[in-house]
């Protein structure tokens, strides 16, 4: 039907007859001449219809926004003064000789241009119109290019793209499963996979030593800007490797992706930071290194002070006291300070102490803070020295259990960085390594894996693991880009006894382990090779590469914050016949007043 995409029409096409197909993006009447901007996925092209050809001109007069047309004409140079360098085709136009209306459109609920601010629910209800916008076309095209880069790179590295089941068994992976009832097996359910974790490990035990898959995963969890109930990840597993092999593989992949998509050259080797250092300096296991602010421990300086908030946390083995210096922060008003104090309570903090350094040379008289009366001059001076305070700075403090301090002050660090425009431009990629094997659940006080229960400890000894589980480090690693966790992985346990030990430590007894993971434990007995892998979030990576604020902007048909789809009205009720066939009876609806 067409000879060219719109953007392919240029000065090399002058005096040639071309045919394009697309939508009427804009129609303008000027002095009896009709100008059309025709849009396809590649861009815009101006077409001119003159009144001499009355039959074709009459058709052009009927056109409205979003009509679908087929246009034929002769390419000519635009007259001087009408060149539009903002358009890729802005130096040429087409003198229309033929025009066919392929379909009509009523006035759409919004026009697919990039100049309107459109309600998100409306965008998703009419997503097929929203996706016509140039910005959305570019984002999804870039996502395609990202996937192509990944496939080409891994294929060249001798990886095999192998599919794994979508209907599988529910396994505890940290989030709720989406369950699918079985008609053939009444009362029993499949689960949609949260990841292909166990299947890719089984593939390594099957002799396929390099596997990858760009795969859909499902998690029934509360949504955020970077979460969806269904999401896409690059899943990788390799046998007969160590951590260094995987880190080098991903560094090579990211180097190609950034070069081909953004024309940015990444270093051959990315920086690495231990989990402990990341939490100590930034209060986060995914620190944004573009932000210059850091947390500084001061517990040793306030152990004996009269301010109980500080001294009690400083003398608690599970407590922490930190300072966070904000350069030139003295211009913050009392209301600003109160707002930041309210902000940290979201993360469990009971409040936010601060000291304003109005004049460093004036000693205590040059400081402003409600807590100064509880601190000795020596303690205050020691704090100022440690944080290298200057006149005009404000110093915030966090004192509580370490996990509360890390979460609240880490979040405050991020907020201050954005509020005060401290975030440097560019890209900061980082490996976070040497993760703890386990953490204690604050509510149950039971051990739980930091990643998942199939992660190998650095010391391959069941006895050592049992004797000091909270001190054991894992062979685990996360890749962080500009403060976003883009992927994580680990070396896996390949010895059945060690796997049973991990299950036992996290409260999964032999019977439960056999019921949930019997197939894995059986496979581990039949010569499982050392293996490991990683998974990268395609949605998050595409979000960053397109400078989007949400992964919903790089997914063709996303769910809303409430996990619903305005376009299809999913989820929706099931019919009684379907429920009866599946042997399901719904519980009475519970209403609350």
From Swiss-Prot:
Record flagged with keyword Aminoacyl-tRNA synthetase: yes
Chemical reaction(s) catalysed: tRNA(Asx) + L-aspartate + ATP = L-aspartyl-tRNA(Asx) + AMP + diphosphate
A GO MF term: aspartate-tRNA(Asn) ligase activity
Domain of life: Bacteria
Binding locations of L-aspartate: 173, 219, 451, 492
EC assignment: 6.1.1.23
Quaternary state and interactors: Homodimer.
Name the record gives this protein: Aspartate--tRNA(Asp/Asn) ligase
Organism this protein belongs to: Legionella pneumophila (strain Corby)
């Amino acid at each position: 039907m067409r000879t060219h995409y719109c953007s392919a029409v240029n000065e090399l096409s002058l005096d040639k007859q071309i045919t394009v197909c697309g939508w009427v993006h804009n129609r303008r009447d000027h002095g009896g001449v009709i100008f059309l901007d025709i849009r396809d996925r590649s861009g815009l092209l101006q077409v001119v219809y003159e009144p001499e050809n009355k039959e074709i001109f009459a058709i052009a007069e009927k056109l409205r926004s979003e009509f679908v047309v087929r246009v034929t004409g002769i390419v000519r140079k635009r007259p001087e003064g009408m060149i539009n360098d903002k358009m890729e085709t802005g130096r040429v136009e087409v003198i229309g000789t033929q025009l066919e209306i392929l379909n009509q459109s009523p006035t759409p609920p919004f026009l697919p241009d990039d100049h309107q601010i459109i309600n998100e629910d409306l965008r998703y209800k009419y997503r097929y119109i929203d996706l016509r916008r140039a910005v959305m076309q570019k984002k999804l095209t870039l996502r395609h290019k990202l996937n192509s880069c990944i496939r080409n790179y891994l294929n060249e590295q001798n990886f095999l793209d192998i599919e794994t089941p979508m209907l599988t068994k529910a396994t505890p992976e940290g989030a709720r499963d989406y369950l699918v009832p079985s008609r053939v097996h009444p009362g029993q359910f499949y689960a949609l996979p949260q990841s292909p974790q166990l299947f890719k490990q089984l593939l390594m035990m099957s002799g396929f030593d390099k596997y990858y898959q760009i795969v859909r995963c499902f998690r029934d969890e509360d949504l955020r800007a970077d979460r969806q109930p269904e999401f896409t990840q690059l899943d990788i597993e390799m046998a007969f490797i160590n951590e260094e092999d995987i880190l080098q593989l991903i560094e090579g992949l990211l180097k190609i992706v950034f070069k081909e998509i953004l024309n940015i050259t990444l270093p051959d080797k990315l920086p690495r930071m231990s989990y402990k250092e990341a939490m100590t300096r930034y209060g986060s296991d995914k620190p944004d290194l573009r932000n210059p602010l850091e947390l500084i421990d001061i517990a040793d300086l306030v152990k004996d002070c009269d301010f109980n908030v500080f001294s009690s946390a400083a003398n608690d083995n599970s407590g922490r006291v930190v300072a966070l210096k904000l350069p030139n922060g003295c211009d913050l008003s009392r209301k600003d300070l109160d707002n930041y104090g309210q902000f940290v309570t979201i993360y469990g903090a009971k409040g936010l102490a601060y000291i304003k350094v109005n004049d460093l040379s004036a000693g205590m008289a040059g400081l402003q803070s409600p807590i100064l009366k509880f601190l000795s001059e020596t303690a205050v001076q020691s704090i100022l020295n440690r944080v290298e305070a200057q006149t005009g700075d404000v110093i915030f403090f966090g004192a509580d259990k370490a996990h509360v301090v890390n979460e609240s002050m880490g979040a405050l660090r991020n907020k201050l960085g954005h509020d005060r425009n401290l975030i440097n431009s560019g890209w900061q990629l980082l490996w976070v390594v040497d993760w703890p094997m386990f953490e204690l659940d604050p509510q149950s006080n039971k051990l739980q894996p930091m990643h998942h229960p199939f992660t190998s400890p650095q010391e391959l000894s069941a006895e050592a693991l049992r004797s000091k589980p909270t001190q054991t480090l894992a062979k685990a690693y996360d890749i962080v880009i500009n403060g976003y966790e883009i992927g994580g992985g680990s070396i896996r346990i390949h010895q059945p006894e060690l796997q049973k030990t991990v299950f036992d430590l996290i409260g999964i007894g032999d019977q439960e382990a056999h019921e949930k993971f019997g197939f894995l434990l059986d496979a581990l007995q039949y010569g499982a090779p050392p293996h490991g892998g990683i998974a990268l979030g395609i949605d998050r990576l595409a979000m960053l590469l397109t400078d989007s604020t949400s992964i919903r902007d790089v997914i063709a048909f996303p769910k809303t914050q409430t996990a619903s789809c305005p376009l299809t009205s999913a989820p929706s009720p099931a019919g009684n016949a379907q429920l009866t066939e599946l042997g399901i009876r719904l519980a009475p609806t519970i209403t609350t007043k």
